Amino acid sequence: MSSAIQLRGLAWDHRRCWGPLEASVPAYRALQPDIQVAWNRRSLWEFGEGRLDGPAADYDLVIYDHPFVGEVARDGLMLDLMRFLSVDQIASFA
C-alpha cells in the first residue's frame, strides 16, 4: 500500500499557468516523492463566471489568476502555505 500523499490541484488553462507548473513537476517529485498532485485545468472564463469558493472547497491546491486574487483574499479562500511546510522544504525554494 502506498503511503504517498495524494492531492488534487486546479490551474487555469493558459500556458502562462500550466507551462511553469508542468516544468516544475519533475524537480518537485524528485524532492518530494511521497507527495503526488493530480492537476486539472479550468478555463479562465470558467473561473470568472463561476463562484471562486467552489474550486477552493473541491481542490487541495488552486492557482487563481491575478484578477481574482482580491476576491479570493476577501473571502478567506487562501491559506498560508508556509504553515504546512518544514524549514527544510521552505529552504529548498530559495
Describe the predicted segments one by one.
Residues 1-69:
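Conserved N-terminal structural module of periplasmic/extracytoplasmic solute-binding proteins
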